Amino acid sequence: MEFNHVSVLLNETVDSVVTNPDGIYVDCTLGGAGHAHAVGERLSSQGMIIGLDQDEDALSVARQRLSDLKCQVLTIPTNFSNLKEALRNAGIYEVDGFIFDLGVSSYQLDTPERGFSYMNDGPLDMRMDKEAPLTAEEVVNEYDAEALLQIIRDYGEERWAKRIVEFIVNARQEKRITTTGELVRIIKNAIPAKARQDGPHPAKRTFQAIRIEVNRELAILHDSFVDAVSMLKPKGKIGVITFHSLEDRITKQTFKELSTACICPPELPMCVCNHKAVVKAKNKAIEPSAGEIEVNPRARSAKLRVAVKL
């Protein structure tokens, strides 16, 4: 199986997170194992790299790619929202570092039958876990107009959301929308020609929004980061790579919450929350170099945020 995927901010992530060659590191979004393999190359035979992924296609390729490492390797078929339970079931209670790469893999984007791509026609699917019940086809055809509007406006930050929803609703009344190509044509018709001349592909934001809804991507981030930090050893690190402002905002806010000693309302005269800071977060996100963006244009919007367990 061909699984071409260029890992974003590879060296920056590994340099930021890996500090102990004998440590245990978890790649929570294993994918094609680009980050995991680079981490594994830094580890001794006593070290361990653990990869989590809900996509069986990715796991199959990753296991093969990681087979040449001298460190211990464990892959677990699960979504990172289950990371604490999955790791404990594997006998792991403390971890030296976590990596989250929140982007969709190039393999998923470039495989039409997975339904993520607005560049190639395929079934409206978009499930990262192919056994999950909700598909993009169901979202597009069965959600009411108000729910669709909220998803495309909030998750896609699409200025033409209302018009796009109107066109989707009109189209599905005539015929069920079943392919990515059909949806792309509807979106293009909804967005005025002048607005389509500049910027990214006109369907990019809507596809992003539907993908986030199908996979509950934003809903699980905060709690997953908190779970990961709770399992970090002192001085262990968590690195999160985001690709759009919604993910980055949640990451930044969660790190701020975890690095703040008191979260009481400012009007209270004294602290009553007993909240303790558990991490120190780097203030500035790390972004790709111009050279990396030239080689891999998909890296353009990537940001890496890192926090250290106190």
Question: Residue spans of the language-model regions?
Answer:
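S-adenosyl-L-methionine-dependent methyltransferase catalytic core, i.e., the SAM/SAH-binding region
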Residues: 1-310
